[in-house]
Protein backbone atom coordinates (compact mmCIF):
# COMPACT_ATOMS: atom_id res chain seq x y z
CA UNK A 1 0.00 0.00 0.00
CA UNK A 2 2.89 2.38 0.80
CA UNK A 3 4.29 1.76 -2.68
CA UNK A 4 1.02 2.78 -4.34
CA UNK A 5 0.73 5.91 -2.20
CA UNK A 6 4.33 6.87 -2.93
CA UNK A 7 3.80 6.35 -6.66
CA UNK A 8 0.69 8.56 -6.62
CA UNK A 9 2.74 11.23 -4.87
CA UNK A 10 5.52 10.76 -7.43
CA UNK A 11 3.18 11.11 -10.41
CA UNK A 12 1.62 14.23 -8.92
CA UNK A 13 5.12 15.72 -8.97
CA UNK A 14 6.32 14.27 -12.29
CA UNK A 15 3.19 15.35 -14.18
CA UNK A 16 3.50 19.05 -13.36
CA UNK A 17 3.99 21.25 -16.42
CA UNK A 18 7.61 22.09 -15.58
CA UNK A 19 8.70 18.51 -14.95
CA UNK A 20 6.89 17.25 -18.06
CA UNK A 21 8.75 19.87 -20.10
CA UNK A 22 12.08 18.86 -18.54
CA UNK A 23 11.41 15.18 -19.27
CA UNK A 24 10.57 16.11 -22.86
CA UNK A 25 13.72 18.21 -23.29
CA UNK A 26 15.91 15.54 -21.69
CA UNK A 27 14.45 12.79 -23.89
CA UNK A 28 14.89 14.94 -27.00
CA UNK A 29 18.49 15.90 -26.20
CA UNK A 30 19.28 12.33 -25.14
CA UNK A 31 18.11 10.97 -28.47
CA UNK A 32 20.19 13.59 -30.29
CA UNK A 33 23.29 12.68 -28.26
CA UNK A 34 22.67 9.00 -28.96
CA UNK A 35 22.43 9.72 -32.68
CA UNK A 36 25.60 11.81 -32.87
CA UNK A 37 28.98 10.05 -32.84
CA UNK A 38 31.58 11.55 -30.55
CA UNK A 39 29.59 12.40 -27.43
CA UNK A 40 28.10 9.93 -24.99
CA UNK A 41 25.61 10.13 -22.13
CA UNK A 42 28.25 10.86 -19.46
CA UNK A 43 29.55 13.96 -21.24
CA UNK A 44 26.01 14.93 -22.23
CA UNK A 45 24.81 14.85 -18.62
CA UNK A 46 27.90 16.75 -17.48
CA UNK A 47 27.24 19.48 -20.07
CA UNK A 48 23.68 19.95 -18.78
CA UNK A 49 24.57 20.11 -15.07
CA UNK A 50 25.40 23.86 -15.14
CA UNK A 51 21.93 24.49 -16.58
CA UNK A 52 20.35 22.81 -13.55
CA UNK A 53 21.83 25.15 -10.93
CA UNK A 54 18.74 27.37 -10.97
CA UNK A 55 16.34 24.39 -10.86
CA UNK A 56 15.01 22.45 -7.94
CA UNK A 57 16.63 19.05 -7.33
CA UNK A 58 13.64 17.08 -8.66
CA UNK A 59 13.55 18.90 -11.99
CA UNK A 60 17.33 18.74 -12.35
CA UNK A 61 17.49 14.97 -11.87
CA UNK A 62 14.46 14.42 -14.14
CA UNK A 63 16.27 16.31 -16.91
CA UNK A 64 19.49 14.30 -16.52
CA UNK A 65 17.90 10.87 -16.15
CA UNK A 66 15.61 11.39 -19.14
CA UNK A 67 18.65 12.40 -21.18
CA UNK A 68 20.43 9.26 -19.98
CA UNK A 69 17.88 6.74 -21.15
CA UNK A 70 17.10 8.86 -24.23
CA UNK A 71 20.62 8.21 -25.51
CA UNK A 72 19.96 4.48 -25.47
CA UNK A 73 17.30 4.76 -28.18
CA UNK A 74 19.18 7.41 -30.17
CA UNK A 75 21.97 4.98 -30.98
CA UNK A 76 19.44 2.57 -32.46
CA UNK A 77 18.45 4.96 -35.25
CA UNK A 78 21.89 5.13 -36.84
CA UNK A 79 22.49 1.42 -36.23
CA UNK A 80 19.41 0.49 -38.26
CA UNK A 81 19.47 3.18 -40.94
CA UNK A 82 23.21 3.63 -41.49
CA UNK A 83 24.93 0.60 -39.94
CA UNK A 84 26.74 3.02 -37.61
CA UNK A 85 26.03 2.65 -33.87
CA UNK A 86 25.56 6.02 -32.18
CA UNK A 87 26.28 4.26 -28.86
CA UNK A 88 28.42 1.20 -28.16
CA UNK A 89 25.42 -0.68 -26.79
CA UNK A 90 23.68 -0.41 -30.18
CA UNK A 91 26.55 -2.03 -32.09
CA UNK A 92 25.00 -5.50 -31.90
CA UNK A 93 21.76 -4.09 -33.36
CA UNK A 94 23.59 -3.33 -36.60
CA UNK A 95 23.73 -7.05 -37.44
CA UNK A 96 20.01 -7.60 -37.93
CA UNK A 97 18.72 -4.03 -37.84
CA UNK A 98 20.67 -2.88 -40.89
CA UNK A 99 19.90 -6.17 -42.65
CA UNK A 100 16.20 -5.44 -42.11
CA UNK A 101 16.73 -1.92 -43.42
CA UNK A 102 18.26 -3.23 -46.65
CA UNK A 103 15.09 -5.30 -47.05
CA UNK A 104 12.99 -2.14 -46.78
CA UNK A 105 11.90 -2.95 -43.19
CA UNK A 106 13.83 -0.22 -41.35
CA UNK A 107 10.61 1.28 -40.03
CA UNK A 108 9.53 -2.04 -38.56
CA UNK A 109 12.94 -2.49 -36.89
CA UNK A 110 12.79 0.98 -35.35
CA UNK A 111 9.19 0.49 -34.21
CA UNK A 112 9.97 -2.81 -32.50
CA UNK A 113 13.09 -1.26 -30.95
CA UNK A 114 10.99 1.62 -29.60
CA UNK A 115 8.33 -0.73 -28.20
CA UNK A 116 10.98 -3.01 -26.68
CA UNK A 117 12.81 -0.04 -25.17
CA UNK A 118 9.56 1.18 -23.63
CA UNK A 119 8.71 -2.23 -22.14
CA UNK A 120 12.27 -2.84 -20.95
CA UNK A 121 12.49 0.57 -19.30
CA UNK A 122 9.09 0.11 -17.67
CA UNK A 123 10.04 -3.36 -16.40
CA UNK A 124 13.23 -2.00 -14.81
CA UNK A 125 11.34 0.92 -13.27
CA UNK A 126 8.81 -1.47 -11.70
CA UNK A 127 11.76 -3.43 -10.30
CA UNK A 128 13.11 -0.19 -8.79
CA UNK A 129 9.73 0.60 -7.23
CA UNK A 130 9.49 -2.75 -5.46
CA UNK A 131 13.20 -3.00 -4.61
CA UNK A 132 13.33 0.46 -3.08
CA UNK A 133 11.56 -0.45 0.16
CA UNK A 134 13.48 -3.61 1.16
CA UNK A 135 16.88 -2.31 0.06
CA UNK A 136 16.52 1.06 1.76
CA UNK A 137 15.30 -0.54 5.01
CA UNK A 138 18.36 -2.80 4.92
CA UNK A 139 20.72 0.07 4.11
CA UNK A 140 19.28 2.28 6.87
CA UNK A 141 20.97 -0.08 9.34
CA UNK A 142 24.35 0.97 7.94
CA UNK A 143 26.82 3.04 9.91
CA UNK A 144 30.10 4.55 8.62
CA UNK A 145 31.80 1.12 8.77
CA UNK A 146 29.21 -0.52 6.53
CA UNK A 147 29.11 2.45 4.16
CA UNK A 148 32.88 2.32 3.73
CA UNK A 149 32.68 -1.39 2.94
CA UNK A 150 29.80 -0.82 0.50
CA UNK A 151 31.69 1.92 -1.34
CA UNK A 152 34.77 -0.31 -1.51
CA UNK A 153 32.63 -3.07 -3.01
CA UNK A 154 31.23 -0.73 -5.65
CA UNK A 155 34.69 0.52 -6.62
CA UNK A 156 36.19 -2.97 -6.70
CA UNK A 157 33.35 -4.33 -8.84
CA UNK A 158 33.75 -1.58 -11.41
CA UNK A 159 37.54 -1.89 -11.31
CA UNK A 160 37.62 -5.69 -11.45
CA UNK A 161 35.26 -5.76 -14.43
CA UNK A 162 36.69 -2.74 -16.28
CA UNK A 163 38.47 -4.15 -19.29
CA UNK A 164 41.29 -6.53 -19.96
CA UNK A 165 43.82 -5.30 -17.40
CA UNK A 166 42.90 -5.09 -13.72
CA UNK A 167 46.25 -3.41 -13.04
CA UNK A 168 45.40 -0.58 -15.42
CA UNK A 169 41.94 -0.27 -13.87
CA UNK A 170 43.46 -0.10 -10.37
CA UNK A 171 45.90 2.56 -11.53
CA UNK A 172 43.02 4.64 -12.86
CA UNK A 173 41.09 4.12 -9.62
CA UNK A 174 44.05 5.38 -7.58
CA UNK A 175 44.40 8.33 -9.96
CA UNK A 176 40.75 9.23 -9.37
CA UNK A 177 41.21 8.96 -5.60
CA UNK A 178 44.25 11.25 -5.81
CA UNK A 179 42.15 13.82 -7.66
CA UNK A 180 39.44 13.50 -5.00
CA UNK A 181 41.98 14.34 -2.27
CA UNK A 182 42.74 17.77 -3.74
CA UNK A 183 41.24 20.64 -1.75
CA UNK A 184 40.43 21.30 1.89
CA UNK A 185 40.70 18.41 4.35
CA UNK A 186 37.09 17.82 5.49
CA UNK A 187 38.17 16.93 9.05
CA UNK A 188 41.14 19.19 9.82
CA UNK A 189 40.31 22.06 7.47
CA UNK A 190 43.84 22.29 6.07
CA UNK A 191 44.61 22.48 2.31
CA UNK A 192 45.89 19.35 0.55
CA UNK A 193 47.72 19.21 -2.80
CA UNK A 194 46.56 22.72 -3.72
CA UNK A 195 50.06 24.11 -4.46
CA UNK A 196 48.86 27.47 -3.10
CA UNK A 197 46.36 27.82 -5.95
CA UNK A 198 43.08 29.38 -4.86
CA UNK A 199 41.25 27.57 -7.67
CA UNK A 200 42.14 24.20 -6.12
CA UNK A 201 40.86 25.00 -2.63
CA UNK A 202 37.43 23.59 -3.51
CA UNK A 203 38.96 20.60 -5.26
CA UNK A 204 38.87 19.50 -8.89
CA UNK A 205 35.37 19.92 -10.31
CA UNK A 206 34.01 16.64 -11.62
CA UNK A 207 32.00 18.34 -14.40
CA UNK A 208 35.00 19.63 -16.42
CA UNK A 209 36.89 16.39 -15.72
CA UNK A 210 34.07 14.24 -17.10
CA UNK A 211 33.47 16.54 -20.07
CA UNK A 212 37.16 16.24 -20.92
CA UNK A 213 37.51 12.50 -20.37
CA UNK A 214 34.31 11.38 -22.07
CA UNK A 215 33.48 14.25 -24.43
CA UNK A 216 36.58 16.00 -25.71
CA UNK A 217 38.69 12.82 -25.72
CA UNK A 218 36.04 11.04 -27.81
CA UNK A 219 35.96 13.91 -30.30
CA UNK A 220 39.76 13.94 -30.60
CA UNK A 221 39.79 10.20 -31.22
CA UNK A 222 37.02 10.37 -33.82
CA UNK A 223 38.68 13.32 -35.56
CA UNK A 224 41.58 11.04 -36.53
CA UNK A 225 39.32 9.12 -38.88
CA UNK A 226 37.59 10.80 -41.82
CA UNK A 227 33.83 10.28 -41.67
CA UNK A 228 32.58 9.23 -45.06
CA UNK A 229 29.00 9.97 -46.01
CA UNK A 230 27.03 6.87 -45.10
CA UNK A 231 24.47 5.28 -47.37
CA UNK A 232 21.06 5.72 -45.80
CA UNK A 233 18.68 2.80 -45.98
CA UNK A 234 15.21 3.56 -47.28
CA UNK A 235 12.31 3.25 -44.88
CA UNK A 236 8.78 2.26 -45.74
CA UNK A 237 6.11 1.42 -43.16
CA UNK A 238 6.57 1.85 -39.42
CA UNK A 239 3.83 -0.63 -38.54
CA UNK A 240 5.00 -4.18 -37.69
CA UNK A 241 2.93 -7.16 -38.80
CA UNK A 242 1.24 -9.54 -36.39
CA UNK A 243 4.01 -12.05 -37.06
CA UNK A 244 6.65 -9.44 -36.21
CA UNK A 245 4.89 -8.77 -32.92
CA UNK A 246 4.59 -12.49 -32.11
CA UNK A 247 8.28 -13.00 -32.92
CA UNK A 248 9.21 -10.09 -30.63
CA UNK A 249 7.26 -11.00 -27.48
CA UNK A 250 9.75 -13.57 -26.17
CA UNK A 251 12.88 -11.50 -26.97
CA UNK A 252 11.36 -8.43 -25.31
CA UNK A 253 10.53 -10.35 -22.12
CA UNK A 254 13.97 -11.99 -21.98
CA UNK A 255 15.71 -8.71 -22.78
CA UNK A 256 13.81 -6.94 -20.00
CA UNK A 257 15.00 -9.46 -17.43
CA UNK A 258 18.61 -9.62 -18.70
CA UNK A 259 19.01 -5.84 -18.88
CA UNK A 260 17.47 -5.18 -15.47
CA UNK A 261 19.50 -7.91 -13.75
CA UNK A 262 22.83 -6.85 -15.27
CA UNK A 263 22.07 -3.18 -14.63
CA UNK A 264 22.27 -3.91 -10.91
CA UNK A 265 25.94 -4.90 -11.15
CA UNK A 266 28.53 -2.09 -11.13
CA UNK A 267 31.00 -2.49 -13.98
CA UNK A 268 28.65 -4.39 -16.29
CA UNK A 269 27.93 -2.10 -19.24
CA UNK A 270 24.76 -1.91 -21.27
CA UNK A 271 26.84 -3.21 -24.18
CA UNK A 272 27.21 -6.46 -22.24
CA UNK A 273 23.45 -6.60 -21.66
CA UNK A 274 22.75 -6.09 -25.37
CA UNK A 275 25.29 -8.72 -26.38
CA UNK A 276 24.03 -11.31 -23.88
CA UNK A 277 20.45 -10.68 -24.98
CA UNK A 278 21.50 -11.29 -28.60
CA UNK A 279 23.26 -14.52 -27.63
CA UNK A 280 20.18 -15.61 -25.66
CA UNK A 281 17.97 -15.07 -28.70
CA UNK A 282 20.27 -17.08 -30.94
CA UNK A 283 20.17 -19.97 -28.47
CA UNK A 284 16.39 -19.74 -28.09
CA UNK A 285 15.76 -19.58 -31.82
CA UNK A 286 14.88 -22.59 -33.96
CA UNK A 287 16.92 -21.01 -36.78
CA UNK A 288 20.04 -19.46 -35.22
CA UNK A 289 21.80 -19.54 -38.59
CA UNK A 290 19.45 -16.81 -39.83
CA UNK A 291 20.66 -14.25 -37.30
CA UNK A 292 22.49 -11.47 -39.10
CA UNK A 293 20.14 -11.68 -42.08
CA UNK A 294 17.33 -9.53 -40.67
CA UNK A 295 15.79 -11.44 -37.74
CA UNK A 296 13.42 -9.24 -35.74
CA UNK A 297 14.49 -11.03 -32.53
CA UNK A 298 18.04 -9.75 -33.13
CA UNK A 299 16.70 -6.22 -32.77
CA UNK A 300 14.00 -6.68 -30.13
CA UNK A 301 16.11 -8.55 -27.55
CA UNK A 302 19.24 -6.34 -27.50
CA UNK A 303 17.35 -3.04 -27.67
CA UNK A 304 15.02 -4.06 -24.85
CA UNK A 305 17.99 -5.15 -22.73
CA UNK A 306 19.79 -1.90 -23.50
CA UNK A 307 17.01 0.31 -22.16
CA UNK A 308 16.21 -2.02 -19.26
CA UNK A 309 19.88 -1.85 -18.27
CA UNK A 310 19.80 1.97 -18.29
CA UNK A 311 16.85 2.05 -15.88
CA UNK A 312 18.05 -0.96 -13.86
CA UNK A 313 21.41 0.71 -13.28
CA UNK A 314 19.60 3.40 -11.30
CA UNK A 315 18.43 0.88 -8.67
CA UNK A 316 21.75 0.67 -6.73
CA UNK A 317 22.13 4.46 -6.98
CA UNK A 318 18.72 5.27 -5.51
CA UNK A 319 18.68 2.55 -2.86
CA UNK A 320 22.34 2.18 -1.82
CA UNK A 321 24.04 5.29 -3.19
CA UNK A 322 26.38 3.29 -5.43
CA UNK A 323 26.81 4.36 -9.08
CA UNK A 324 27.23 1.48 -11.52
CA UNK A 325 28.62 3.40 -14.51
CA UNK A 326 30.27 6.74 -15.34
CA UNK A 327 26.95 8.26 -16.40
CA UNK A 328 25.27 7.17 -13.17
CA UNK A 329 28.23 8.65 -11.30
CA UNK A 330 27.58 11.98 -13.05
CA UNK A 331 23.92 11.83 -12.00
CA UNK A 332 25.08 11.07 -8.45
CA UNK A 333 27.33 14.13 -8.64
CA UNK A 334 24.33 16.21 -9.69
CA UNK A 335 22.44 14.97 -6.61
CA UNK A 336 25.35 16.05 -4.42
CA UNK A 337 25.62 19.47 -6.08
CA UNK A 338 21.96 20.01 -5.14
CA UNK A 339 22.66 19.07 -1.52
CA UNK A 340 21.29 15.51 -1.67
CA UNK A 341 23.05 12.19 -1.12
CA UNK A 342 21.42 9.35 -3.08
CA UNK A 343 20.84 6.23 -1.03
CA UNK A 344 18.49 5.06 1.72
CA UNK A 345 18.25 8.46 3.41
CA UNK A 346 16.96 9.97 0.18
CA UNK A 347 13.68 8.04 0.54
CA UNK A 348 13.44 8.95 4.22
CA UNK A 349 14.36 12.64 4.14
CA UNK A 350 13.47 13.65 0.56
CA UNK A 351 10.75 11.22 -0.46
CA UNK A 352 9.18 13.76 -2.82
CA UNK A 353 12.41 13.95 -4.84
CA UNK A 354 12.97 10.18 -4.92
CA UNK A 355 9.44 9.22 -5.93
CA UNK A 356 9.01 12.19 -8.25
CA UNK A 357 12.08 11.14 -10.22
CA UNK A 358 11.03 7.46 -10.22
CA UNK A 359 7.58 8.37 -11.57
CA UNK A 360 9.27 10.45 -14.25
CA UNK A 361 10.91 7.27 -15.58
CA UNK A 362 7.46 6.06 -16.65
CA UNK A 363 6.70 9.45 -18.15
CA UNK A 364 10.04 9.62 -19.95
CA UNK A 365 9.59 6.19 -21.50
CA UNK A 366 6.16 7.19 -22.83
CA UNK A 367 7.63 10.40 -24.25
CA UNK A 368 10.39 8.45 -25.99
CA UNK A 369 7.87 6.03 -27.48
CA UNK A 370 5.73 8.86 -28.86
CA UNK A 371 8.53 11.25 -29.75
CA UNK A 372 11.18 9.38 -31.64
CA UNK A 373 9.54 7.67 -34.60
CA UNK A 374 8.03 10.89 -36.05
CA UNK A 375 11.40 12.66 -35.67
CA UNK A 376 13.56 10.09 -37.45
CA UNK A 377 13.73 12.30 -40.56
CA UNK A 378 15.13 15.19 -38.51
CA UNK A 379 17.81 13.01 -36.92
CA UNK A 380 18.85 11.78 -40.36
CA UNK A 381 19.17 15.37 -41.64
CA UNK A 382 21.38 16.25 -38.67
CA UNK A 383 23.63 13.31 -39.51
CA UNK A 384 24.16 14.76 -43.00
CA UNK A 385 25.92 17.79 -41.47
CA UNK A 386 29.71 17.44 -41.97
CA UNK A 387 31.33 15.94 -38.89
CA UNK A 388 33.85 18.78 -38.63
CA UNK A 389 31.04 21.29 -38.14
CA UNK A 390 29.33 19.05 -35.57
CA UNK A 391 32.64 18.73 -33.68
CA UNK A 392 33.04 22.50 -33.59
CA UNK A 393 29.52 23.04 -32.27
CA UNK A 394 29.87 20.31 -29.63
CA UNK A 395 33.24 21.65 -28.45
CA UNK A 396 31.82 25.18 -28.19
CA UNK A 397 29.01 23.89 -25.95
CA UNK A 398 31.56 21.98 -23.86
CA UNK A 399 33.68 25.07 -23.31
CA UNK A 400 30.60 27.11 -22.44
CA UNK A 401 29.39 24.38 -20.06
CA UNK A 402 32.76 24.07 -18.32
CA UNK A 403 33.00 27.84 -17.88
CA UNK A 404 29.47 28.19 -16.55
CA UNK A 405 30.09 25.78 -13.63
CA UNK A 406 31.85 28.49 -11.63
CA UNK A 407 32.45 31.24 -14.24
CA UNK A 408 36.11 30.32 -14.23
CA UNK A 409 38.57 29.92 -17.09
CA UNK A 410 40.38 27.47 -14.82
CA UNK A 411 37.57 24.94 -15.30
CA UNK A 412 37.91 25.31 -19.07
CA UNK A 413 41.63 24.61 -18.75
CA UNK A 414 40.86 21.53 -16.62
CA UNK A 415 38.45 20.24 -19.27
CA UNK A 416 40.99 20.76 -22.06
CA UNK A 417 43.73 19.10 -20.00
CA UNK A 418 41.62 16.05 -19.21
CA UNK A 419 40.51 15.88 -22.82
CA UNK A 420 44.13 15.33 -23.81
CA UNK A 421 44.69 12.98 -20.85
CA UNK A 422 41.60 10.96 -21.77
CA UNK A 423 42.70 10.77 -25.40
CA UNK A 424 46.13 9.42 -24.40
CA UNK A 425 44.63 6.95 -21.91
CA UNK A 426 42.30 5.62 -24.62
CA UNK A 427 45.27 5.16 -26.94
CA UNK A 428 46.99 2.95 -24.37
CA UNK A 429 43.77 1.07 -23.50
CA UNK A 430 43.35 2.45 -19.96
CA UNK A 431 39.74 2.35 -18.70
CA UNK A 432 38.28 5.74 -17.81
CA UNK A 433 35.31 4.63 -15.72
CA UNK A 434 37.33 3.98 -12.49
CA UNK A 435 38.59 7.59 -12.56
CA UNK A 436 35.09 9.02 -12.51
CA UNK A 437 33.78 6.57 -9.92
CA UNK A 438 36.60 7.16 -7.43
CA UNK A 439 36.62 10.92 -8.06
CA UNK A 440 32.96 11.15 -6.99
CA UNK A 441 32.95 8.40 -4.34
CA UNK A 442 36.36 9.34 -2.93
CA UNK A 443 35.16 12.05 -0.50
CA UNK A 444 32.32 9.82 0.75
CA UNK A 445 34.70 6.91 1.22
CA UNK A 446 37.24 9.08 3.05
CA UNK A 447 34.60 10.48 5.40
CA UNK A 448 33.27 7.00 6.24
CA UNK A 449 36.81 5.68 6.78
CA UNK A 450 37.85 8.49 9.09
CA UNK A 451 34.59 8.41 11.05
CA UNK A 452 35.05 4.67 11.56
CA UNK A 453 38.62 5.10 12.76
CA UNK A 454 37.59 7.88 15.14
CA UNK A 455 34.93 5.59 16.63
CA UNK A 456 37.48 2.79 17.10
CA UNK A 457 40.26 5.17 18.22
CA UNK A 458 42.41 4.23 15.24
CA UNK A 459 41.83 0.47 15.23
CA UNK A 460 41.19 -1.14 11.82
CA UNK A 461 39.61 -4.06 13.65
CA UNK A 462 36.30 -2.18 13.57
CA UNK A 463 35.90 -3.16 9.92
CA UNK A 464 35.78 -6.82 10.94
CA UNK A 465 33.49 -6.32 13.94
CA UNK A 466 30.47 -5.86 11.69
CA UNK A 467 29.27 -9.00 9.86
CA UNK A 468 27.83 -6.91 7.01
CA UNK A 469 31.05 -4.95 6.55
CA UNK A 470 33.11 -8.15 6.69
CA UNK A 471 31.03 -9.78 3.96
CA UNK A 472 31.10 -6.67 1.77
CA UNK A 473 34.87 -6.27 2.13
CA UNK A 474 35.40 -9.97 1.39
CA UNK A 475 33.34 -9.58 -1.80
CA UNK A 476 35.37 -6.49 -2.71
CA UNK A 477 38.63 -8.43 -2.39
CA UNK A 478 37.13 -11.31 -4.37
CA UNK A 479 36.23 -9.04 -7.29
CA UNK A 480 39.77 -7.66 -7.34
CA UNK A 481 41.59 -11.00 -7.25
CA UNK A 482 39.19 -13.00 -9.45
CA UNK A 483 40.79 -11.76 -12.71
CA UNK A 484 44.21 -12.78 -11.37
CA UNK A 485 42.98 -16.34 -10.75
CA UNK A 486 41.52 -16.39 -14.25
CA UNK A 487 44.87 -15.33 -15.68
CA UNK A 488 46.67 -17.98 -13.61
CA UNK A 489 44.33 -20.71 -14.85
CA UNK A 490 44.96 -19.69 -18.45
CA UNK A 491 48.69 -19.78 -17.87
CA UNK A 492 48.42 -23.21 -16.27
CA UNK A 493 46.56 -24.57 -19.29
CA UNK A 494 49.23 -23.25 -21.65
CA UNK A 495 52.05 -24.87 -19.66
CA UNK A 496 50.24 -28.18 -19.46
CA UNK A 497 49.67 -28.14 -23.20
CA UNK A 498 53.42 -27.87 -23.76
CA UNK A 499 53.93 -31.24 -22.18
CA UNK A 500 56.62 -29.96 -19.80
CA UNK A 501 54.54 -29.43 -16.69
CA UNK A 502 54.25 -32.22 -14.19
State where each predicted segment sits:
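Membrane-embedded alpha-helical modules
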Residues: 111-227, 337-491
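Helix-loop-helix hairpins and the membrane-proximal interhelical loops
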Residues: 1-60, 191-295, 380, 397-403, ...
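Flexible loop linkers connecting adjacent transmembrane helices
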Residues: 47, 81-108, 134, 143, ...
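Re-entrant/interfacial helical elements at transmembrane boundaries that shape
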Residues: 41-51, 64, 79-99, 130, ...
Amino acid sequence: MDVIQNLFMGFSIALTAQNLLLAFIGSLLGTLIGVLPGIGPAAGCAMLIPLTFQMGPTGAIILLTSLFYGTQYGGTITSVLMNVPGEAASAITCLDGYAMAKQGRAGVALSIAAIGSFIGGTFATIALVFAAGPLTRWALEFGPVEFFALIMLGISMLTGLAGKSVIKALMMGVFGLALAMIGIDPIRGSPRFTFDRVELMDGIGFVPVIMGLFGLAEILENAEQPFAQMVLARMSTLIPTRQDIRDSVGPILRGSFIGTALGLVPGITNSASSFLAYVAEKKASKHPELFGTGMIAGVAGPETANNAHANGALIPLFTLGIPSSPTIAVIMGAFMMHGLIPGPLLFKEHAEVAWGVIASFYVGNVILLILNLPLIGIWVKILKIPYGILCGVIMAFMILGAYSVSSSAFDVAVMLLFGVVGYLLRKFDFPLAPIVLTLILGPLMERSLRQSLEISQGSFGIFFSSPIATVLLALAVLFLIAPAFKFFRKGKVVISGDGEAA
